[in-house]
Amino acid sequence: MSSFGYRTLTVALFTLICCPGSDEKVFEVHVRPKKLAVEPKGSLEVNCSTTCNQPEVGGLETSLDKILLDEQAQWKHYLVSNISHDTVLQCHFTCSGKQESMNSNVSVYQPPRQVILTLQPTLVAVGKSFTIECRVPTVEPLDSLTLFLFRGNETLHYETFGKAAPAPQEATATFNSTADREDGHRNFSCLAVLDLMSRGGNIFHKHSAPKMLEIYEPVSDSQMVIIVTVVSVLLSLFVTSVLLCFIFGQHLRQQRMGTYGVRAAWRRLPQAFRP
C-alpha cells in the first residue's frame, strides 16, 4: 500500500472513532444524591436529570415505593419511601434512541443508642488482671462501626468490624488489662463511633456510663505467715482460756456438791445413831 493510501485509512479510522455521526448524540444522566444513608423505614428525595434537551423517556427504577413529585423535560423529582434494606436506585433517560443511566446507592443504618461497659471483676488486687468489655446492641452497618475503650483519657484498645449480614447486629469489644494502684482513681469508659461519611451519611457518637475499679494491695507471703501465726496464737489462747474456765467451774461445782452431800447425809441419819 502506498504512503498516501495508508494516511487516508488512518484518517478515516480516526474520524470514525473520535467523531461519531449525528445520529449518535452524546448525553449524560445525573442523580442526586449519589449515595445516602437512611434509618429503617425511612424515605428520601431523588432527582434524576439529563443533558439531553428532548429525552424520549426517563425515570427512576426501584423496587421500593416511589412518588413522582415534580418533573420538567430534563429532570424528574421523586420521593422514595419505606426503605428497609440497602438498595440501588437507577435513574435512566433515552435520547435519540440511546439509553444512559446512573445509580444511587442507599444504605440503611441504625446508630448506637446504647453502649454497655462491664468490668470483671470489679474488686482487683494490684498486679492482677481484669477484663473490660464493651457491648453495643442493635447497630448497623458493622463495617462502619469502631469501639474505643478508655482508661481516663488514655485509649487502651479499639476494635473495628468486618462486613456482616445487612441486619442489626450486636457488637462487642473485649480487652484484658493489669490493675495498678492508680486504677482505683480512674474512670473506665467506652465510645462507639458509627462513621457513615463514605455512605453519604453523618458520624454518630455514643458514650457508655463511666465505671471504676476497687483496688487493694495484695498480702505478701511474709505478712501472711505473721498473720497466720498471730491468729493461731490468739486462737490457742482463746481455746486454753475456755478450757481453764470450764475445768475451774467444774472443780468449784464438785467442791460445793461435796459439802452439801455430807450435810444432807447427816440430816437423814436417825437420831439414835447420832453422837
Curated annotation (Swiss-Prot):
Gene3D superfamilies: Immunoglobulins (2.60.40.10). Residues 249-275 are cytoplasmic. Residues 251-275 are annotated as: Required for interaction with EZR, MSN and RDX and co-localization to microvilli. GO terms for molecular function: integrin binding. Residues 25-223 are extracellular. GO terms for biological process: cell adhesion; cell-cell adhesion. Pfam families: ICAM_N. The chain crosses the membrane at residues 224-248. Residues 41-98, 127-197 form the Ig-like C2-type domain. GO terms for cellular component: cleavage furrow; membrane; microvillus; plasma membrane; uropod. PANTHER family: INTERCELLULAR ADHESION MOLECULE (PTHR13771), INTERCELLULAR ADHESION MOLECULE 2 (PTHR13771:SF3). This is Intercellular adhesion molecule 2. It comes from Homo sapiens.
